């Protein structure tokens, strides 16, 4: 079922096909859309409805867009579904995360190679046994971009959750024993970071046959705090944004007819 306004705009994001490029960067924070758009040539705002703030410009003379998704899987899935209706085919999430391994310091850029589906949205797309993995071509482009811009980065699995405070205040939850046991299990499995959107994005991408990827700034590390190690806080997302933008340029070049 496709819901549109009478003006043929998609119902939630308020956009039509001519508003967007086929390559879309997806921050969670609406305020970050404008910051990312400043990396485009000729950026202009094309939409602002609910949590979905959208700018379109060009990279390598190709139309590209940035649209915020808000927090979590449901709003991410709604936004991406509607962008797919409009013809978008490549999506890179740019967001923040919390480090889980003690050597993943704040300021590190994590490129997700898979996501733990500890959330609900992806379960309405595919059985729980189905893996949440990004597109290999997009992930490779993110890796090359991180190397090109020379930022500290790591590749690995991330954990996706629906309850932010279930992670940070598990003792206040009736299911605290399960939350704590699984958290330690994921750390033992070498999960790099925790966030809230990638699992839904990756599974949706597989189901809808579009390309997805994710690059995440680590803003802090509660494992380091628990071990009595220094845990600085880093909130500047510029390095993650640069990696995403350069990856889009690489993908455009690779996709261009030779």
Curated annotation (Swiss-Prot):
InterPro entries: Nucleoside_phosphorylase_CS, Nucleoside_phosphorylase_d, Nucleoside_phosphorylase_sf, Uridine_phosphorylase. GO terms for biological process: nucleoside catabolic process; nucleotide catabolic process; UMP salvage. It is an enzyme of class 2 (transferase). Coiled coil: none annotated. Pfam families: PNP_UDP_1. Pathway: Pyrimidine metabolism; UMP biosynthesis via salvage pathway; uracil from uridine (phosphorylase route): step 1/1. Signal peptide: none annotated. It catalyses: uridine + phosphate = alpha-D-ribose 1-phosphate + uracil. Its EC number is 2.4.2.3. Keywords: Cytoplasm, Glycosyltransferase, Transferase. Its main location: cytoplasm. It is found in: Cytoplasm. One of its GO terms (molecular function) is uridine phosphorylase activity. One of its GO terms (cellular component) is cytosol. Catalyzes the reversible phosphorylytic cleavage of uridine to uracil and ribose-1-phosphate. PANTHER family: FI09636P-RELATED, URIDINE PHOSPHORYLASE. Belongs to the PNP/UDP phosphorylase family. This is Uridine phosphorylase. It comes from Treponema pallidum (strain Nichols). The lineage of its organism: Bacteria, Pseudomonadati, Spirochaetota, Spirochaetia, Spirochaetales. The gene is udp.
């Amino acid at each position: 079922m496709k819901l549109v306004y009478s003006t043929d705009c998609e119902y939630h994001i308020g956009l039509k096909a001519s508003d967007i490029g086929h390559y879309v960067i997806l921050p969670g924070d609406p305020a970050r859309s404008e910051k990312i758009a400043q990396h485009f040539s000729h950026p202009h705002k094309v939409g602002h409805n609910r949590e979905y703030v959208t700018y379109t410009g060009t990279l390598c003379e190709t139309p590209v867009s940035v649209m915020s998704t808000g927090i979590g899987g449901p709003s991410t899935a709604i936004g991406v579904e509607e962008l797919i209706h409009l013809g978008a085919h490549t999506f890179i999430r740019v967001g923040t995360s919390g480090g889980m391994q003690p050597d993943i310091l704040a300021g590190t850029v994590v490129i997700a190679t898979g996501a733990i589906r500890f959330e609900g949205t992806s379960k309405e797309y595919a059985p729980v046994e189905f893996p949440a993995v990004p597109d290999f071509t997009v992930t490779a482009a993110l890796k090359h971009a991180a190397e090109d811009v020379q930022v500290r980065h790591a590749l690995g699995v991330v954990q996706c959750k629906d309850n932010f405070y279930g992670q940070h205040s598990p003792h206040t939850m009736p299911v605290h024993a399960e939350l704590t046991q699984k958290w330690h299990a994921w750390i033992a499995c070498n999960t790099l970071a925790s966030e809230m959107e990638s699992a839904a994005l990756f599974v949706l991408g597989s189901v809808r046959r579009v390309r997805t990827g994710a690059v995440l700034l680590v803003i802090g590390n509660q494992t380091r705090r628990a071990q009595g190690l220094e845990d600085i806080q880093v909130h500047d997302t510029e390095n993650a944004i640069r990696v995403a933008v350069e990856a889009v340029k690489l993908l455009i070049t690779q996709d261009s007819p030779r």
